[in-house]
Amino acid sequence: MAGNSIGQLFRVTTFGESHGLALGCIVDGVPPGIELTEADLQHDLDRRRPGTSRYTTQRREPDQVKILSGVFEGRTTGTSIGLLIENTDQRSQDYGAIKDVFRPGHADYTYEQKFGFRDYRGGGRSSARETAMRVAAGAIAKKYLAQKFGIVIRGCLTQMGDIPLAIKDWDLVEQNPFFCADADKIDALDELMRALKKEGDSIGAKVTVIADGVPPGLGEPVFDRLDADIAHAMMSINAVKGVEIGDGFEVVALRGSQNRDEITAQGFQSNHAGGILGGISSGQQIVANIALKPTSSITVPGHTINRAGEEVEMITKGRHDPCVGIRAVPIAEAMLAIVLMDHFLRQRAQNADVIPPLPRW
Protein backbone atom coordinates (compact mmCIF):
# COMPACT_ATOMS: atom_id res chain seq x y z
CA MET A 1 0.00 0.00 0.00
CA ALA A 2 1.68 3.18 -1.18
CA GLY A 3 0.92 6.67 0.07
CA ASN A 4 2.10 6.27 3.66
CA SER A 5 4.91 8.85 3.49
CA ILE A 6 5.16 12.60 3.08
CA GLY A 7 8.18 14.83 2.48
CA GLN A 8 11.47 14.50 0.62
CA LEU A 9 14.30 15.43 2.98
CA PHE A 10 12.18 15.57 6.13
CA ARG A 11 10.20 12.41 5.52
CA VAL A 12 7.45 11.00 7.72
CA THR A 13 6.13 7.47 7.22
CA THR A 14 3.25 6.26 9.41
CA PHE A 15 1.82 2.82 10.05
CA GLY A 16 -0.96 1.23 12.10
CA GLU A 17 -4.74 0.95 12.28
CA SER A 18 -7.43 2.29 14.57
CA HIS A 19 -7.91 -0.99 16.43
CA GLY A 20 -4.49 -2.55 15.86
CA LEU A 21 -1.92 -3.10 18.57
CA ALA A 22 -0.20 0.23 18.02
CA LEU A 23 0.42 3.20 15.77
CA GLY A 24 3.88 4.21 14.71
CA CYS A 25 6.00 6.32 12.42
CA ILE A 26 9.52 6.70 11.12
CA VAL A 27 10.87 10.24 10.82
CA ASP A 28 13.87 10.62 8.51
CA GLY A 29 15.96 13.73 7.95
CA VAL A 30 15.97 15.15 11.46
CA PRO A 31 19.22 17.12 11.94
CA PRO A 32 21.54 15.80 14.66
CA GLY A 33 22.07 17.47 18.00
CA ILE A 34 18.51 18.64 18.70
CA GLU A 35 17.48 18.22 22.33
CA LEU A 36 14.44 15.95 22.18
CA THR A 37 12.43 14.01 24.75
CA GLU A 38 9.06 12.30 24.74
CA ALA A 39 7.71 15.23 26.73
CA ASP A 40 8.46 17.52 23.77
CA LEU A 41 6.04 15.47 21.67
CA GLN A 42 3.43 14.77 24.32
CA HIS A 43 2.03 18.29 24.62
CA ASP A 44 0.56 18.35 21.12
CA LEU A 45 -0.53 14.72 21.41
CA ASP A 46 -2.50 15.63 24.53
CA ARG A 47 -4.20 18.43 22.59
CA ARG A 48 -5.26 15.96 19.88
CA ARG A 49 -6.03 12.86 21.90
CA PRO A 50 -9.60 11.59 22.29
CA GLY A 51 -11.68 11.61 25.44
CA THR A 52 -10.46 14.95 26.76
CA SER A 53 -13.86 16.69 26.72
CA ARG A 54 -17.55 15.90 26.37
CA TYR A 55 -17.47 17.39 22.87
CA THR A 56 -15.18 14.76 21.36
CA THR A 57 -15.18 10.98 21.06
CA GLN A 58 -15.17 9.26 24.43
CA ARG A 59 -12.63 6.68 23.33
CA ARG A 60 -10.03 7.16 26.06
CA GLU A 61 -6.52 6.71 24.77
CA PRO A 62 -3.56 8.05 26.78
CA ASP A 63 -1.57 8.41 23.53
CA GLN A 64 1.72 8.10 25.39
CA VAL A 65 4.44 8.27 22.76
CA LYS A 66 7.62 6.24 22.96
CA ILE A 67 10.84 7.20 21.19
CA LEU A 68 12.33 3.94 19.94
CA SER A 69 15.38 5.18 18.03
CA GLY A 70 17.27 8.18 16.74
CA VAL A 71 17.76 9.85 20.12
CA PHE A 72 20.71 9.25 22.46
CA GLU A 73 21.37 11.02 25.75
CA GLY A 74 18.53 13.42 25.01
CA ARG A 75 19.75 14.52 21.57
CA THR A 76 18.88 13.48 18.05
CA THR A 77 21.58 11.42 16.37
CA GLY A 78 20.69 12.26 12.77
CA THR A 79 19.41 8.74 12.14
CA SER A 80 15.80 7.63 11.71
CA ILE A 81 13.58 8.45 14.66
CA GLY A 82 11.10 5.68 15.46
CA LEU A 83 7.95 6.62 17.38
CA LEU A 84 5.24 4.34 18.80
CA ILE A 85 1.86 4.82 20.47
CA GLU A 86 0.03 1.77 21.81
CA ASN A 87 -3.74 1.44 21.37
CA THR A 88 -5.32 0.66 24.74
CA ASP A 89 -9.06 1.43 24.50
CA GLN A 90 -10.25 -0.44 21.42
CA ARG A 91 -13.86 -1.67 21.52
CA SER A 92 -13.90 -3.65 18.30
CA GLN A 93 -17.21 -5.28 19.24
CA ASP A 94 -18.88 -1.93 18.49
CA TYR A 95 -18.12 -2.53 14.82
CA GLY A 96 -19.27 -6.14 14.41
CA ALA A 97 -22.58 -4.97 12.96
CA ILE A 98 -20.84 -3.19 10.05
CA LYS A 99 -18.58 -6.05 9.03
CA ASP A 100 -20.59 -6.57 5.86
CA VAL A 101 -22.16 -3.10 5.59
CA PHE A 102 -20.67 0.04 4.04
CA ARG A 103 -21.09 3.13 6.20
CA PRO A 104 -22.24 6.00 3.96
CA GLY A 105 -19.73 8.85 3.77
CA HIS A 106 -16.84 6.68 4.99
CA ALA A 107 -14.00 4.91 3.22
CA ASP A 108 -15.54 1.45 3.73
CA TYR A 109 -16.85 1.19 0.17
CA THR A 110 -13.75 2.60 -1.54
CA TYR A 111 -11.29 0.49 0.48
CA GLU A 112 -13.32 -2.61 -0.35
CA GLN A 113 -13.34 -1.68 -4.03
CA LYS A 114 -9.60 -0.98 -4.07
CA PHE A 115 -8.26 -3.87 -1.99
CA GLY A 116 -11.11 -6.40 -2.04
CA PHE A 117 -10.77 -6.62 1.74
CA ARG A 118 -10.83 -4.16 4.63
CA ASP A 119 -10.32 -3.80 8.36
CA TYR A 120 -13.81 -2.73 9.41
CA ARG A 121 -12.86 -2.03 13.05
CA GLY A 122 -13.12 1.72 13.41
CA GLY A 123 -12.18 2.23 9.79
CA GLY A 124 -8.79 0.54 10.09
CA ARG A 125 -6.10 2.47 8.26
CA SER A 126 -8.59 5.12 7.07
CA SER A 127 -9.36 6.20 10.64
CA ALA A 128 -8.25 9.60 11.92
CA ARG A 129 -6.55 7.68 14.71
CA GLU A 130 -3.57 7.51 12.34
CA THR A 131 -3.07 11.27 12.66
CA ALA A 132 -1.67 10.87 16.18
CA MET A 133 1.64 9.93 14.60
CA ARG A 134 1.60 12.97 12.33
CA VAL A 135 1.16 15.16 15.40
CA ALA A 136 4.12 13.47 17.08
CA ALA A 137 6.31 13.93 14.00
CA GLY A 138 5.07 17.48 13.56
CA ALA A 139 6.11 18.30 17.12
CA ILE A 140 9.71 17.52 16.17
CA ALA A 141 9.46 19.90 13.23
CA LYS A 142 7.78 22.60 15.32
CA LYS A 143 10.54 22.47 17.93
CA TYR A 144 13.32 22.70 15.34
CA LEU A 145 11.66 25.55 13.44
CA ALA A 146 11.01 27.49 16.64
CA GLN A 147 14.52 27.06 18.05
CA LYS A 148 16.48 27.64 14.87
CA PHE A 149 14.38 30.25 13.12
CA GLY A 150 11.85 31.59 15.64
CA ILE A 151 8.93 30.27 13.61
CA VAL A 152 5.66 29.97 15.50
CA ILE A 153 2.86 27.79 14.11
CA ARG A 154 -0.63 28.24 15.56
CA GLY A 155 -4.09 27.08 14.62
CA CYS A 156 -7.64 27.63 15.78
CA LEU A 157 -11.24 26.89 14.86
CA THR A 158 -12.61 29.73 12.72
CA GLN A 159 -16.06 28.38 11.89
CA MET A 160 -18.40 25.67 13.12
CA GLY A 161 -21.53 25.17 11.08
CA ASP A 162 -22.94 28.62 10.41
CA ILE A 163 -21.10 30.22 13.36
CA PRO A 164 -18.08 32.28 12.18
CA LEU A 165 -15.27 32.69 14.71
CA ALA A 166 -12.83 35.59 14.71
CA ILE A 167 -9.17 35.28 15.71
CA LYS A 168 -9.16 37.67 18.67
CA ASP A 169 -7.03 36.10 21.38
CA TRP A 170 -4.52 33.31 20.72
CA ASP A 171 -4.09 32.74 24.46
CA LEU A 172 -7.75 31.73 24.64
CA VAL A 173 -7.28 28.82 22.23
CA GLU A 174 -5.73 26.56 24.87
CA GLN A 175 -8.31 27.54 27.48
CA ASN A 176 -11.48 26.11 25.91
CA PRO A 177 -12.43 22.73 24.40
CA PHE A 178 -13.10 24.20 20.95
CA PHE A 179 -9.64 25.64 20.17
CA CYS A 180 -11.55 28.90 19.68
CA ALA A 181 -9.93 32.36 19.78
CA ASP A 182 -13.25 34.21 20.01
CA ALA A 183 -14.57 34.39 23.59
CA ASP A 184 -17.88 35.89 22.46
CA LYS A 185 -18.84 32.71 20.57
CA ILE A 186 -17.96 29.95 23.04
CA ASP A 187 -21.46 29.81 24.53
CA ALA A 188 -22.97 29.50 21.05
CA LEU A 189 -20.60 26.64 20.23
CA ASP A 190 -21.51 24.92 23.47
CA GLU A 191 -25.21 25.23 22.67
CA LEU A 192 -24.70 23.87 19.15
CA MET A 193 -22.72 20.87 20.38
CA ARG A 194 -25.33 20.01 22.99
CA ALA A 195 -28.03 20.09 20.32
CA LEU A 196 -26.00 17.88 17.99
CA LYS A 197 -25.39 15.27 20.67
CA LYS A 198 -29.09 15.23 21.50
CA GLU A 199 -29.99 14.83 17.81
CA GLY A 200 -27.28 12.27 17.16
CA ASP A 201 -25.98 14.38 14.29
CA SER A 202 -22.72 16.15 13.40
CA ILE A 203 -21.48 19.43 11.89
CA GLY A 204 -18.66 20.68 9.66
CA ALA A 205 -15.97 23.20 10.54
CA LYS A 206 -13.20 25.44 9.29
CA VAL A 207 -9.73 25.54 10.83
CA THR A 208 -7.15 28.27 10.22
CA VAL A 209 -3.45 27.60 10.70
CA ILE A 210 -0.82 30.35 10.58
CA ALA A 211 2.97 30.32 10.55
CA ASP A 212 4.77 33.46 11.74
CA GLY A 213 8.45 34.12 11.10
CA VAL A 214 8.88 32.09 7.91
CA PRO A 215 11.66 33.69 5.83
CA PRO A 216 11.32 34.32 2.09
CA GLY A 217 12.60 31.69 -0.31
CA LEU A 218 10.92 28.43 0.69
CA GLY A 219 9.28 26.51 -2.13
CA GLU A 220 10.39 24.82 -5.33
CA PRO A 221 9.08 25.78 -8.76
CA VAL A 222 7.03 24.48 -10.38
CA PHE A 223 5.47 21.24 -9.20
CA ASP A 224 6.77 21.49 -5.63
CA ARG A 225 5.41 24.94 -4.91
CA LEU A 226 5.13 25.62 -1.20
CA ASP A 227 1.40 26.23 -1.41
CA ALA A 228 0.92 23.07 -3.48
CA ASP A 229 2.72 21.01 -0.85
CA ILE A 230 0.73 22.65 1.94
CA ALA A 231 -2.51 21.87 0.11
CA HIS A 232 -1.37 18.28 -0.43
CA ALA A 233 -0.56 17.89 3.26
CA MET A 234 -3.82 19.43 4.45
CA MET A 235 -5.95 17.42 2.03
CA SER A 236 -4.40 14.25 3.45
CA ILE A 237 -6.09 14.95 6.80
CA ASN A 238 -9.24 12.92 7.33
CA ALA A 239 -12.50 14.75 6.50
CA VAL A 240 -10.78 17.72 4.82
CA LYS A 241 -12.65 18.65 1.64
CA GLY A 242 -11.14 22.03 0.85
CA VAL A 243 -7.97 24.08 1.36
CA GLU A 244 -7.42 27.81 0.93
CA ILE A 245 -4.13 29.68 0.96
CA GLY A 246 -4.54 33.32 1.93
CA ASP A 247 -7.85 34.72 0.73
CA GLY A 248 -8.55 31.54 -1.21
CA PHE A 249 -11.91 31.48 -2.96
CA GLU A 250 -12.66 35.04 -1.84
CA VAL A 251 -10.31 36.31 -4.57
CA VAL A 252 -12.99 35.44 -7.13
CA ALA A 253 -14.90 38.59 -6.17
CA LEU A 254 -11.83 40.86 -6.06
CA ARG A 255 -10.18 42.96 -8.73
CA GLY A 256 -6.46 42.86 -9.37
CA SER A 257 -6.07 46.31 -7.87
CA GLN A 258 -7.60 44.98 -4.65
CA ASN A 259 -5.97 41.58 -4.48
CA ARG A 260 -2.33 42.33 -5.27
CA ASP A 261 -0.12 42.76 -2.24
CA GLU A 262 1.61 46.07 -2.92
CA ILE A 263 5.15 46.63 -1.66
CA THR A 264 6.73 49.76 -0.23
CA ALA A 265 10.13 50.43 1.30
CA GLN A 266 8.55 49.46 4.61
CA GLY A 267 7.27 46.11 3.34
CA PHE A 268 4.08 44.51 2.05
CA GLN A 269 0.88 46.47 2.52
CA SER A 270 -1.42 43.43 2.62
CA ASN A 271 -1.32 39.64 2.62
CA HIS A 272 -4.07 38.38 0.34
CA ALA A 273 -1.63 35.77 -1.00
CA GLY A 274 -1.22 34.13 2.39
CA GLY A 275 2.54 34.58 2.47
CA ILE A 276 3.29 32.72 -0.77
CA LEU A 277 3.97 34.21 -4.22
CA GLY A 278 4.81 32.04 -7.22
CA GLY A 279 4.92 29.04 -4.93
CA ILE A 280 7.70 30.59 -2.81
CA SER A 281 7.36 32.10 0.66
CA SER A 282 7.43 35.90 0.75
CA GLY A 283 8.41 36.34 4.39
CA GLN A 284 4.87 37.24 5.46
CA GLN A 285 2.55 35.16 7.59
CA ILE A 286 1.67 31.89 5.91
CA VAL A 287 -2.08 31.46 6.22
CA ALA A 288 -4.04 28.32 5.33
CA ASN A 289 -7.69 27.45 5.90
CA ILE A 290 -9.15 23.96 5.75
CA ALA A 291 -12.78 22.89 5.49
CA LEU A 292 -13.77 19.68 7.25
CA LYS A 293 -16.96 17.82 6.46
CA PRO A 294 -19.33 16.68 9.22
CA THR A 295 -18.54 13.13 10.23
CA SER A 296 -20.79 10.44 8.81
CA SER A 297 -20.60 8.43 12.05
CA ILE A 298 -23.97 9.52 13.43
CA THR A 299 -27.01 7.83 14.96
CA VAL A 300 -29.41 9.40 12.47
CA PRO A 301 -30.57 6.48 10.26
CA GLY A 302 -29.27 6.47 6.69
CA HIS A 303 -29.42 4.28 3.60
CA THR A 304 -26.59 2.11 2.29
CA ILE A 305 -25.86 -1.37 0.93
CA ASN A 306 -24.19 -4.50 2.24
CA ARG A 307 -21.57 -6.66 0.54
CA ALA A 308 -24.32 -8.58 -1.22
CA GLY A 309 -25.54 -5.34 -2.82
CA GLU A 310 -28.74 -5.28 -0.78
CA GLU A 311 -30.15 -1.99 0.48
CA VAL A 312 -30.12 -1.67 4.27
CA GLU A 313 -30.69 1.02 6.88
CA MET A 314 -27.60 2.15 8.77
CA ILE A 315 -27.15 3.60 12.26
CA THR A 316 -23.51 4.03 13.28
CA LYS A 317 -22.63 2.84 16.76
CA GLY A 318 -19.40 3.51 18.58
CA ARG A 319 -17.70 6.59 20.01
CA HIS A 320 -17.39 9.52 17.63
CA ASP A 321 -16.80 13.28 17.42
CA PRO A 322 -19.86 15.49 16.75
CA CYS A 323 -17.41 17.91 15.08
CA VAL A 324 -14.13 16.46 13.83
CA GLY A 325 -12.86 19.97 13.14
CA ILE A 326 -12.14 20.54 16.82
CA ARG A 327 -9.37 17.97 17.13
CA ALA A 328 -8.11 18.80 13.64
CA VAL A 329 -6.40 21.96 14.95
CA PRO A 330 -3.20 20.30 16.25
CA ILE A 331 -3.21 18.00 13.21
CA ALA A 332 -3.24 20.96 10.80
CA GLU A 333 -0.45 22.62 12.78
CA ALA A 334 1.60 19.43 12.52
CA MET A 335 1.12 19.09 8.77
CA LEU A 336 2.15 22.71 8.16
CA ALA A 337 5.23 22.17 10.33
CA ILE A 338 6.19 19.02 8.42
CA VAL A 339 5.94 20.81 5.07
CA LEU A 340 7.91 23.84 6.25
CA MET A 341 10.59 21.64 7.81
CA ASP A 342 10.97 19.71 4.56
CA HIS A 343 11.29 22.89 2.51
CA PHE A 344 13.81 24.38 4.95
CA LEU A 345 16.06 21.37 4.49
CA ARG A 346 15.61 21.50 0.72
CA GLN A 347 16.41 25.21 0.62
CA ARG A 348 19.49 24.69 2.77
CA ALA A 349 20.68 21.83 0.56
CA GLN A 350 20.54 23.84 -2.67
CA ASN A 351 20.78 27.50 -1.73
CA ALA A 352 22.74 27.64 1.53
CA ASP A 353 25.16 30.18 0.06
CA VAL A 354 22.49 32.51 -1.34
CA ILE A 355 22.39 35.91 0.36
CA PRO A 356 18.99 37.55 -0.27
CA PRO A 357 19.65 40.85 -2.07
CA LEU A 358 16.54 42.54 -0.69
CA PRO A 359 15.67 43.34 2.93
CA ARG A 360 13.35 41.19 5.00
CA TRP A 361 10.69 43.22 6.74
Curated annotation (Swiss-Prot):
CDD domains noted in UniProt: Chorismate_synthase
Cysteine pairs bridged by disulfides in the record: none
Family stated for the protein in its record: Belongs to the chorismate synthase family.
Gene: aroC
Name of the protein this chain belongs to: Chorismate synthase
Cofactor note: Reduced FMN (FMNH(2)).
Cellular component terms per the entry's GO annotation: cytosol
Keyword annotations of the record: Amino-acid biosynthesis, Aromatic amino acid biosynthesis, FAD, Flavoprotein, FMN, Lyase, NADP
Subunit description: Homotetramer.
Species the sequence originates in: Enterobacter sp. (strain 638)
Its EC number(s): 4.2.3.5
Positions that bind NADP(+): 48, 54
Catalysed reaction, written as an equation: 5-O-(1-carboxyvinyl)-3-phosphoshikimate = chorismate + phosphate
Source species taxonomy: Bacteria, Pseudomonadati, Pseudomonadota, Gammaproteobacteria, Enterobacterales
